[in-house]
Amino acid sequence: FGIGKLQDNYFQSSVINFEEDRSDRSLYRLIGGSISFYGSTLNSRQYATKGYNEKLIAQIFTGKERYKPGNPAEQPVTQERQSWLQISYMKEAYHSMAPKFVLGWMAEALYSSRNFSENFTATMMQAAEFSPTPHSKLMYNEAFRANQFLAAGIKPMFIFNDMFHLRGEFYGFMPIFPIEKNTQNKAFYGKAFSKVEYMGEVSVICQLP
């Protein structure tokens, strides 16, 4: 259980005059709670090569959004209170296929009944994200955000020794209902299962004892 306040500052256009333009702001005041179940035998919290990890999380939230445009000529908007449920499940596992070769896989599914925010940009910033790699967790990418999605991937690895391994990670991401925007920059749901996005990463990992 928790009480929180979130604030997103953003521009709704890719053409920005930083001397004159002011960012829009969406402020959320929320109350929520969650219950989760975890199980893990991974040999490392990051870049694991053995074991499995599984988690099921259910969350419920209620709150209000206040939108303040960057343009002072426009009036702020406060949305009615909304409540929503979010459920997610993820599992990853690693299997030794040969003395030097490991094959990992992962699958993730998420469902959220959250309504749209005041505009498309605010909606996407608050949508659930698929970020299976450390690098993807640092990046904002609208292509891998949705209120409901399915995702899966494989992780082939070549083990050099106890410290070094070559790791590939390749994922597919499918929003159940992709979030689109209209000409007024408002969000709406597109056709079900109409988009698939892909993500790949290859890296050499050094894990110190």
Language model features with spans:
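C-terminal outer-membrane beta-barrel translocator/porin domains of Gram-negative envelope proteins
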Residues: D21-S26, L30-N161, G168
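Transmembrane beta-barrel wall of Gram-negative outer-membrane proteins
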Residues: F1-E20
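Short, small-residue-rich loop/turn micro-motifs
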Residues: I3, I60, G172
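Predominantly the C-terminal beta-signal and adjacent terminal strand-loop region
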Residues: K191-P209
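Hydrophobic alpha-helix feature that most strongly marks membrane-spanning transmembrane helices
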Residues: K155, I159-H165, E169, F173, ...
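Short acidic/His/Gly/Ser-rich catalytic and metal-binding motifs that mark active-site loops
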Residues: Q7-Q12, G63-K68, I176-E180
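Short, surface-exposed loop/helix-turn segments at secondary-structure junctions
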Residues: N182-A192
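Active/binding-pocket-proximal capping segment
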Residues: M124-E129, L166-P178, N185
